[in-house]
């Protein structure tokens, strides 16, 4: 089974970023001689190299503290130098051509790992209508519960072409992001992947602390609603039904999207001039 395969891997080192009970148990059962993970309750049972992390800082920095003793140098906190094979780029090009997407397009991920992070379906429908008025193609990504949300958005817009890509792995997603004009979505893994690929993005935040979970990068905008979170607002309950997110209206997000497009256009001439100077 899985545990047998895990132990047969004979790893010298296990690094547990999650620090949860399940991942800690797997770290211990791996048989690795060196097991690194965050300090916490029962950490001594799982790791022989526990690390005290500052969880008040951005998770990028907190997780980096585990690696400080193992590697030299720092990983970039902005764009990562992804290396993609030609077959990956050709696959994404084929996806776009099959959907007849020839105009600039925006990638939207409406889903999230928890309901309290999800912007309302009707808001996404309104936003898509406004984006289409600017002749932007709409590409939505997501699987599982995300698919049901995307279907609900599409039902409200029977005459609008919404292209759903649900068969993409991580390399294909990066290739898609590198072709897109910008990204819109809530606090989720794809949001961070888009930022690391260098894509301009508009992030829709509710109770999540942006000091810890905001997308990194020079071209990321984090939006919140006009109403503050309640004192008890967390992943399990909110006396105001998470109005910190629901008070973020589509018109504000569309305004941020428009500003993002303007910023992209303003960067293009400088890039063109730089290319001209370095390539006479």
Q: Where are the predicted features?
A:
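Catalytic machinery of carbohydrate-active enzymes
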Residues: 1-280
């Amino acid at each position: 089974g899985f545990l047998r395969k895990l132990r047969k891997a004979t790893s010298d080192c296990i690094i547990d970023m999650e620090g949860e009970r399940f991942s800690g148990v797997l770290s211990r059962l791996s048989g690795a001689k060196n097991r690194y993970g965050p300090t916490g309750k029962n950490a001594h049972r799982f790791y022989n190299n526990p690390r005290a992390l500052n969880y008040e800082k951005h998770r990028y920095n907190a997780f980096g503290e585990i690696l400080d003793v193992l590697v030299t140098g720092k990983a970039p906190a902005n764009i990562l130098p992804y290396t993609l094979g030609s077959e990956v780029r050709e696959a994404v090009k084929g996806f776009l051509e099959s959907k007849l997407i020839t105009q600039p397009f925006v990638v939207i991920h409406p889903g999230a790992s928890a309901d309290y992070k999800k912007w309302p379906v009707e808001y996404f429908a309104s936003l898509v209508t406004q984006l289409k008025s600017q002749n932007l193609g709409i590409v939505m990504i997501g699987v599982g519960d995300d698919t049901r949300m995307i279907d609900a958005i599409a039902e409200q817009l029977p005459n609008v072409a919404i292209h759903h890509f649900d068969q993409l792995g991580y390399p294909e997603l990066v290739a898609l992001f590198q072709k897109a004009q910008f990204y819109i979505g809530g606090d989720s893994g794809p949001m961070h992947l888009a930022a690391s690929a260098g894509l301009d993005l508009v992030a829709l935040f509710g109770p999540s602390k942006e000091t810890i979970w905001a997308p990194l990068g020079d071209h990321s905008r984090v939006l919140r609603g006009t109403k503050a979170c309640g004192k008890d607002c967390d992943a399990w309950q909110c006396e105001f039904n998470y109005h910190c997110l629901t008070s973020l209206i589509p018109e504000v997000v569309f305004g941020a999207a428009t500003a993002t497009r303007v910023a992209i256009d303003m960067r293009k001439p400088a890039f063109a001039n730089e290319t001209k100077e370095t390539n006479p």
